[in-house]
Amino acid sequence: MAYRKLGRTSAQRKAMLRDLATDLIINERIQTTETRAKELRSVVEKMITLGKRGDLHARRQAAAFIRNEVANAETGQDALQKLFADVAPRYAERQGGYTRIAKIGPRRGDAAPMVIIELV
């Protein structure tokens, strides 16, 4: 199994990827480091594929990973509902490749390569 350690323990890495995946689903675009974005890409693609399946088992698998955060305060929609109701149907005809990574230059302070990862 190939993955990046990202300088964290496995629990910290899983928590960080859960947070980033939830934020990406809610905001549809986030700014992060290049290595985090590349690792996040595979996680989010799997979540969107679960959303496209749309059955109860897929919903429960996604719920086990996605954080329970409010995506839209007006409607009370949470991140999981947004994934299954808004994001996944958008990619019904697309077989993978749901995200785009665009480089934006180094971060001030430590010169880490920064990118914007967004849903296509």
UniProtKB/Swiss-Prot annotation:
MF terms (GO), sorted A to Z: structural constituent of ribosome
GO CC term (a single one): cytosolic large ribosomal subunit
Biological process according to GO: translation
Endpoints of the signal sequence: none
Entry keyword set: Ribonucleoprotein, Ribosomal protein
Pfam family, one: Ribosomal_L17
NCBIfam families documented for this protein: L17 (TIGR00059)
Family affiliation: Belongs to the bacterial ribosomal protein bL17 family.
Subunit-level organization: Part of the 50S ribosomal subunit. Contacts protein L32.
UniProt name for this protein: Large ribosomal subunit protein bL17
